[in-house]
Every structure is written in structure tokens, then in C-alpha cells.
Curated annotation (Swiss-Prot):
Name of the protein this chain belongs to: Co-chaperonin GroES
One Gene Ontology term from the biological process aspect of the record: chaperone cofactor-dependent protein refolding
Protein family membership: Belongs to the GroES chaperonin family.
PROSITE patterns referenced in this protein's UniProt entry, alphabetically: CHAPERONINS_CPN10
Pfam families associated with the record: Cpn10 (PF00166)
GO CC entries: cytoplasm
Keywords: Chaperone, Cytoplasm
């Protein structure tokens, strides 16, 4: 897959969602919520500061991140679903 995000945008692949609760109840597809956790697949070069310098992103490829439920734009590339979002949409990095 070849997609290079621009500026401070990142490409995220959602992590697989749980199909069972801790109590063993199977969750049907119609009741599942999209996970708000994913892995960064590609990052842009960073955003431009007012003085013209480039501000590097704090996240990097391979980071596991948390993001808002409605963050980003869903795109389909080579049959796989991804999200393109700004770095500001990332709430935190899972260590």
C-alpha cells in the first residue's frame, strides 16, 4: 500500500474489536461499536509553523493510539479500511 499523508495527517488502521464480553456474551455485528483504538500505518511530514519551520509529529508508524469515536475520515485502500485524521485527533498513545 502506498499512501503518504500530507502535513500533520496520519493513516490509522483500527484494531480488531471484541466479539465477546468478559461475561461470555457474544456481541452481534449490529450492536458492535467501532473501536476507538488503532495502529498508525503512515504519518505525514509534519505541520508548518507560522515562521515557516516544520513541526515534527509526536506519533510514529507502529504506535497504538486512542482517538475520538467520530475522528477522521474513513477510506478504503486495496480492500482494507483505514482512517485519515489529524494528529490533534489522537487522544493518547498506548504504551
Amino acid at each position: 500500500m502506498k499512501l503518504q499523508p500530507l502535513a500533520d495527517r496520519i493513516l490509522v488502521k483500527r484494531l480488531a474489536e471484541e466479539t465477546k464480553t468478559k461475561g461470555g456474551i457474544i456481541i452481534p455485528d449490529t450492536a458492535k461499536e467501532k473501536p476507538a483504538e488503532g495502529e498508525i500505518v503512515a504519518v505525514g511530514p509534519g505541520r508548518n509553523a507560522e515562521d515557516g519551520t516544520k513541526i515534527a509529529l509526536e506519533v510514529k508508524v507502529g504506535d497504538r493510539v486512542l482517538f475520538g469515536k467520530y475522528s477522521g475520515t474513513e477510506v478504503k485502500i486495496e480492500g482494507e479500511e483505514y482512517l485519515i485524521m489529524r494528529e490533534d485527533d489522537v487522544l493518547g498513545i498506548v504504551q
